[in-house]
Amino acid sequence: RGSLSNTIIGKNTFLDNQVHIAHNNKIGNNCIIAGQVGFAGSSSIGDNVIIGGQAGIAGHLRIGNNIQIGGGSGVIKDVPDNSKVMGYPAKDLRYFIKDNK
């Protein structure tokens, strides 16, 4: 039981080593979270989300369903369903590749 609100981790969600999850977070079902990922407080992570190692999720965000977040990314705004994002700040993978050619 959390002091502010409960942090909830869904069924079949895998957390690797050194993952930091702050208060009031809700992580959906069937997610894979690689090592050294950090979640600030009060964010909502949907179902079927994959987060690469050393990514950071800012507080008070909504990460949709069926999302892929690249390793080392810094997510500072909401991510809509069925997206692939990468970089710092995290942006749609198509734009990340175009900007880093």
Predicted regions and their residues:
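Long, leucine- and charge-enriched amphipathic alpha-helices
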Residues: 97-101
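Structural signal for interior beta-strand "rungs" in well-ordered beta-sheet cores
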Residues: 1-92
